[in-house]
Amino acid sequence: GYPVIVKASAGGGGKGMRVVASSDDLVRALNLARSEADAAFGNSEVYIEKFVERPRHVEIQILADQHGNILHLGERECSLQRRQQKVLEEAPSVAITPKMRETMGRMAVAGARVVDYVNAGTIEFLVDGQGNFYFMEMNTRIQVEHPVTEMVTGIDLVKEQVRIAAGESLRYEQDEITLRGHAIECRINAENPEEGFLPSPGVVTAYHAPGGMGIRIDSALYGGCEVSPLSSAKQVLDCQFTEFSDSVFHSGRFKVNCKRIDLTNFGKAEFKESCSGSLGP
């Protein structure tokens, strides 16, 4: 029954998606989604699935080698989004219980095994308010938000991906995968918030990244580099951090469960540029 959501089959990122509340809106939504999907991906194919009200976006990271070994490395939550595109990602999710983590991880591994998957990858789920979860899609690649998983597991996912491609076996057993601490990633986008968050290309004339214990920056930015109009505006800079205070960080194990987060560390980033950056709305 309704509501349902129409989605492009050839891509994501919020493109080619339309929520349909009733049968009266279905034809128009299909036409709009197809048109947008064709423009974005060169493929107008769409599909329809259940629309989950106010869901959490939770994804399970996996590694699968050529010898039939598959591991999951816990979850990332990517629920804070704008225009169906991720803004903040964290690991682990405060909404996922150990039992849910085990069940979702086991299902992710089973799904990868059914299709003989080999590589690093991510199984994405939607989680409703009752703790039910629904398969959404699989990303057959390393994702932008992979560093938060690296921060809490201590495992270099890109290195493992290269080892898998070289035909080597995974070096870990499932019971060796543990989550320590809490990591949050924030994307700084090349968008202009004063112009409806339109892409804002230009030259970065000066750039100074934040640093310190628990801070990691993944970026190609440098003073003098150009953010091209052809670049993805949402992939300019990623900043991950694993502490909210020295005492919390040094304790080694903690959980974040709050409505407000102090983003002081992000205030240390300095930009002098002809293009604008934003953390979201």
Identify the role of each PLM range.
Residues 8, 13, 20-240, 253, ...:
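ATP-dependent carboxylate activation and anion-phosphoryl transfer catalytic cores
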Residues 242-254, 264, 269, 274-278:
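Short linear motifs in low-complexity or flexible loops
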Residues 1-5:
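Acidic/histidine-enriched active-site and ligand-binding environments that engage anionic O-linkages
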Residues 257-261:
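Low-complexity, glycine/proline/serine-enriched flexible coil segments
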